[in-house]
Regions:
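Beta-strand/loop-rich accessory regions of lumenal/periplasmic or secreted enzymes
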Residues: 1-214
Length: 214
């Protein structure tokens, strides 16, 4: 089963609304669903050259709070970004989901970059695996959506779900606590007028399946 969606995201500068159509950012996403529970997601963005530069191009997924363990193959073990990699290495890392959730109010943070695959599982080892054949991606976990405004971090820490961001195009570090990192890499910004695409797959897994990826 396939579902295709297309959006036009208008950009307003307070001018004549009739001029906005020519300044839209176009966004398309295709979902392919399979009988075995596998889901493929492909996204494409055409950013208007006059539009504001987004913090990232990503998919925001609502995950069950029963998925309490994270295992990933990518940069770690601490948070890393496209332009700041800390003293990280590329390896397989495991952590509780709660330890990966930032306790501050910034909408973006706690990223793990250059990820090849990510598994989120419950206590029995059952869960989902996110992987991509075409792109390395970044991810972060939170207890609130990026657009949600809370007065205090504690307002959202007990939410009965976990928010997973799959980031296909990050724009570098946006967290002040890591601003002193000095290991910089190129291609860590999103340029206005860019055409960007990324795809990934979500696969139901058990502990045995995850072990096969290691």
């Amino acid at each position: 089963y396939r579902m295709s969606l297309r959006y036009s995201l208008p950009v307003s500068d307070g001018g004549n609304v009739s001029n906005l159509a020519s300044r839209n950012t176009e966004y398309a996403v295709v979902y392919d669903f399979y009988p075995n529970g596998v889901m493929n997601i492909s996204s494409a963005y055409s950013l208007n050259a006059e539009s504001a530069v987004p913090l990232s191009i990503s998919s925001i997924l609502t995950m069950s709070s029963d998925l309490t363990k994270a295992t990933w193959y990518g940069r770690g073990p601490g948070e890393t970004y496209g332009d700041k990699l800390y003293n990280s290495t590329v390896d397989v890392f495991s952590s509780s989901v709660s330890d990966l959730v930032p306790s501050y109010l910034f909408a973006n943070g706690g990223d793990r970059s250059q990820t090849r695959w990510l598994a989120l599982t419950d206590e029995s080892g059952t869960g989902v695996l996110v992987t991509s054949d075409t792109n390395n991606f970044a991810f972060n976990l939170s207890k609130q959506y990026p657009h949600y405004l809370a007065a205090y971090a504690s307002d959202s820490m007990n939410n009965p779900y976990t928010v997973l961001s799959i980031i296909g195009a990050p724009s570098g570090c946006s967290v002040p606590s890591t601003s002193d990192q000095a290991y910089l890499v190129s291609d860590s910004s999103i340029e206005p007028g860019s055409v960007l695409s990324f795809s990934y797959r979500i696969v139901p897994v058990s502990t045995t399946d995850v072990s096969a990826y290691k």
